[in-house]
Every structure is written in C-alpha cells, then in structure tokens.
C-alpha cells in the first residue's frame, strides 16, 4: 500500500524588513514567490515544473491579506497560475498585512508593533480577517476556499469557531515541529 501524502505550500509575499526599518525597506511581492535569477524561477516556477514532472498536485495556501498593501493583481496572477497548473488553492492569512490599512503605519511602529498572530484575538476579529481573505479570493475570481492555514500556524479555539462561522470546514494550522499547540486546547 502506498503512503498517501498531501503536499502543501505557503505562498506569500514578504514584509522584507519594512517593520524593522521602514525608511529603507519595502515589502516584496512576486519576486519573493518566483525567486527569479537570470530570467529563471528558482521558486514557484521550479516547484510547478518539479510537481508536473512527477504528476503530483499540491495544495497551495495563498496569503490574501497582502492585497491591503499590493492591491489584488500581484497575488491574483499567482493564484490563477496555480489553478491553471492543476493545483488546489486555499486560504492563508498573515494579519500583519492589516497594519498597512493605516496610512501612518510607520509612525505607529514604536508604540504598537504589528501582531501577526490570528490566535489571541476575539472571534469577531478573526471572522473579519477570514472575511477579508474570502473577499480577496472572490475579487481574484478563484474558487472559494474550504481550508485555512493561519500565519505561523498560530491557532486557538477561537480560530476554529470563526472558521466554522465563515464556512471553512478544514484547518491546516497545526504543525507540531514548528508551532505545537497548547496541549489542553487543541
């Protein structure tokens, strides 16, 4: 009997030091995913070629809140490329991108650093984050996701309650080697 494995990939843009040094650093969009050197992709393109060469489909958890900084087009193009290559596209959320909603975000850094954890928030806050991610998927005209992976795999029971209320029945938030959940809660 063959072992069944689900290959998953987080597909996300990079804050690239913008919170640590906002005067010199800016977030990076497609290049952080494509990793192009001399016109050849050593990131997403390489992964898609390798998966195709072996007849393997993967699930790509596509981060949606980056649209608050970059707009919809950069990640929409990537999501469509993944779908056209026959892969599954699901929702990934890094709440730190919501920091860019405030035009004075640079000034706030000293007194209120960004929080990239979905855990520890109220259910209403988590539902709003999920709703924003789902809205991005709708604007990108990609199928509505059924699964969520939180940034950094941060999770608590509130996240699952919010997922349920937002119609997301599948979670991919637990990575025991990376971020074990508190034993009593999950």
Give short role names for the model-derived ranges.
Residues 1-147, 153-186:
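Catalytic alpha-helical scaffold of carbohydrate-active enzymes acting on polysaccharides/glycoconjugates
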């Amino acid at each position: 009997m063959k072992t069944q494995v689900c290959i998953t990939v987080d597909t996300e843009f990079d804050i690239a030091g913008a919170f640590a040094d906002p005067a010199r650093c800016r977030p990076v969009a497609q290049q952080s995913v494509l990793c192009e050197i001399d016109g050849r992709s050593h990131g997403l393109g390489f992964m898609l070629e390798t998966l195709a060469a072996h007849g393997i489909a993967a699930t790509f958890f596509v981060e949606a809140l980056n649209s608050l900084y970059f707009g919809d087009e950069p990640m929409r193009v990537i999501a469509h490329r993944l779908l056209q290559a026959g892969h599954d596209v699901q929702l990934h959320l890094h709440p730190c991108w919501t920091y860019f909603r405030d035009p004075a975000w640079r000034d706030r850094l000293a007194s209120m650093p960004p929080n990239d954890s979905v855990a520890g928030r109220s259910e209403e806050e988590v539902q709003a984050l999920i709703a924003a991610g789902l809205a991005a998927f709708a604007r990108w005209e990609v199928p509505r996701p059924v699964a969520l992976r939180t940034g950094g795999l941060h999770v608590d029971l509130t996240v699952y309650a919010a997922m349920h209320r937002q119609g997301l029945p599948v979670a991919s938030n637990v990575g025991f080697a990376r971020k074990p959940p508190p034993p009593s809660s999950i």
